[in-house]
Every structure is written in C-alpha cells, then in structure tokens.
Amino acid sequence: YILDAGLSISFDEVADRLLFWENFKKTYPNNHYKTKVDEYIKQYGAALFKGDDNTRTLWFDENKIADPEAMRAIKKVSISYSLSSPIAQKFEQLIQSNKQLWEQLPKTSGIDADYDSPEQQDIRNQRDALENKIKKNVDELLKPFDN
C-alpha cells in the first residue's frame, strides 16, 4: 500500500484497514496471528496519522496544517469506538485547536530564506515554531504506533 514513498491507496482505505485489524484483534484476542495483527495495526495507524514522504498527513503549507482527505479518514476512526478512536479524537482536537492560529500567522514571502528581510525571518520563525510544537505534540500522541 506504500509505493515510491507514498500511499497507493486512499487515506479512507487506510482507515478501513486499521479499523478492520483493530476489530479483528478485539474479536479474536487469542488468535495465532497476534504479532502480525499488532504489526498491521501499527503500520496502518502510522500511515493514517503520519502518512509517508510523498503522501503526508501534515502539510504545514500556507493555508493548511493537514491534508483534508486524511482528516476525513481520521474523523471516521474517531467516531468508530475502536482502539484508535481516542488517539484520533485527540489528533483532531490538536489540529483543530491550532488551525485558526496557523491560518492567522502572516504568510512568508515565498522567496528563498537566504534572502529574507528581518521581518520575513521573524514570520518564518513564528511559523516554524508553531509547526515544531504541533509535530512534537503529534509525535507524543502517536507513540502507540511507533515501531
């Protein structure tokens, strides 16, 4: 499902697969494939909440923090009463609580950072600081999906 450092399936399909394996684990807690099932849950969870190099969940571009398709899939998980539901809910809250602040920050000039004016450097630093704060919070939240 990951090809050339990008998802070859939609975020919605990743969410469906995560929910399938979490349901399988809950329905069959003593199954013979427990290690493999746990591996699938971690992989699909990481793919949903983090994405991959060419299909990121978090974008931090001028107008948005996260990919809208990814956020719809995360919403599906958040209302599913699954094992990942609390993580998805906290992820949504984190993005939502920072969305307005991100959108209100001044935009960078788009010129190479080496040629920034002091004002543009300050704007870039503000955006970088918020991005790093959000990434740190996301990393903390997603520890259950780390390998």
Indicate residue ranges for each PLM-predicted region:
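Short coil/linker segments at helix-helix boundaries
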Residues: 1-15, 47-79, 109-116
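Long amphipathic alpha-helical segments with strong coiled-coil/leucine-zipper propensity
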Residues: 1-33, 40
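Short solvent-exposed coil/turn linkers within tandem alpha-helical repeat scaffolds
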Residues: 24-36, 76-88
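Short, charged, amphipathic alpha-helical segments
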Residues: 34-39, 61-64, 89-92
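Membrane-proximal bilayer-interacting regions
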Residues: 85-93, 112-116, 121-125
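Extended, charged, solvent-exposed helical/coil segments
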Residues: 101-111
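Short, low-complexity, Pro/Ser/Thr/Gly-rich segments in the mature regions of secreted, periplasmic
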Residues: 130-147
